[in-house]
Design a protein with these regions (language model features):
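C-terminal helical cap and adjacent loop that interface with cofactors, partners, or active-site loops
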Residues: 281-340
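C-terminal substrate-binding/catalytic lobe of Rossmann-fold NAD(P)-dependent oxidoreductases
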Residues: 28-65, 170-171, 176-304
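N-terminal Rossmann-like NAD(P) cofactor-binding subdomain of oxidoreductases
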Residues: 2-196, 203-205, 294-296, 339
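Predominant activation on well-ordered alpha-helical scaffold segments within soluble catalytic domains
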Residues: 18, 155-162, 211-215, 258, ...
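Short, surface-exposed acidic/glycine-rich loop or hinge patches that mediate macromolecular interfaces
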Residues: 11, 77-78, 148, 208, ...
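Secondary-structure boundary/capping motif
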Residues: 153-154, 253, 312-313
Length: 340
């Protein structure tokens, strides 16, 4: 049994992590560390988890124990920089669910997050944990940068095409739609029900922090053209739906495209290739990423759907943790979807 610490475990992603940990046969002690929530009982914050998790005290982030085997860090950007370097120095395994270690270049992080990166050397040892796509040597991995929610939905659906047909691409862009839980638990006027009910709106147009993260990985796969993503809010709590449009400079073989996707995800436990564009309800409450690829003339339309809190955060983090300890990657992960 392993001991686990969740630093910043009182948000939406922390709640999902707690549920998965409670369902995991290889996880023993779980400690939750918080800032303002320190000193509270866990079930005071999450009464819905009664009979699911132990009602322990939330500990202060100023007194993080060295005794855990692995740490999930689910803090706002910038704050993880205060804790992760010392944990790595002590030989601990860390999975960061925030954005502080996703970039390869510290200057790119500083440009988009407006924060000086105080542990840039760790960017050289971190692994970008897109677990369903990259073949990571987890036996030698200390620090996993868990991908963002939008990047997960886009990269899993688009990377197989980029890797095999990058020289055919003229333009590529994505429209993504997210539930309001992606903004976290802090009170925001624009997230009130009276603001979002029956409403859809774009936000952070040409300025979303996930755009350079996605671009970084697409460029590694061979993308030569520019990339853009336009993010929108949906009047739902959970889920991300992404539609990527690729304009080609030449015709390609549709069967070959589908074959490449089938080959890539043939053994995947959590990526499902669909014959029709997925519905968001197919994946909400699950760790699945559902993908459909349509090729017609010189246009490729790729749609994907994920649960932003699970596949886009805690579920993928649990997959990465399982891989780090050579467990079955499905352990602990709960799939309670509306429909599948």
């Amino acid at each position: 049994m392993i001991s686990l610490g969740i630093i910043g475990g009182t948000g939406y992603t922390g709640k999902k992590l707690l549920q998965f940990c409670a369902n995991h046969p290889k996880i023993g002690d779980v400690a939750v560390y918080g800032n303002n929530s320190a000193g509270n009982r866990l079930l005071n914050l999450f009464p819905e988890l009664m009979n699911t998790v132990n009602d322990t005290n939330i500990l202060s982030v100023e007194n993080i124990s060295d005794e855990h085997d692995i740490y999930f860090v689910a803090l706002p950007h910038g704050e993880a920089l205060n804790y992760i370097p010392s944990l790595i120095q002590k030989g601990k395994k860390v999975i960061d669910l925030g954005g502080d270690y996703r970039f390869d270049d510290a200057s790119e992080y500083e440009k988009w997050y407006k924060i000086e990166h105080s542990s840039a050397k760790l960017l050289n040892i971190k692994k970008y944990g897109l677990v369903d796509y990259y073949n990571i040597d987890y036996s030698k991995t200390e620090l996993i940068a868990n991908p963002g929610c939008y990047p997960t939905s886009v990269l899993l659906s688009v990377l197989p095409f980029i890797e095999n047909f990058s020289d055919s691409i003229n333009t590529i862009s994505t429209c993504s739609y997210s539930g309001t839980s992606g903004a976290g638990k802090s009170a925001k006027t624009e997230m009130l029900m009276s603001e979002m009910d029956g409403n859809v709106k774009a936000y952070n147009v040409n300025n979303h922090r996930h755009q350079p993260e996605i671009t970084q990985e697409l460029k590694k796969a061979g993308l030569q053209s520019d990339y853009s993503i336009t993010t929108h809010l949906l009047p739902v709590a959970v889920g991300i739906y992404s539609t990527t449009t690729i304009k080609l400079n030449k015709s390609i073989n549709t069967e070959l495209v589908i074959e490449n996707y089938n080959n890539k995800y043939a053994t995947s436990k959590f990526v499902r290739l669909r014959q029709i564009p997925p519905s968001l309800t197919w994946v909400v409450g699950t760790n699945f990423c559902d993908i459909n690829v349509s090729v017609k003339h010189n246009t490729v339309i790729i749609t994907s759907a994920i649960d932003n809190l699970i596949k886009g955060a805690s579920g993928q983090a649990m997959q990465n943790m399982n891989k780090m300890f050579d467990f079955d990657e499905t352990l602990g992960i709960i799939n309670n979807g509306v429909t599948q």
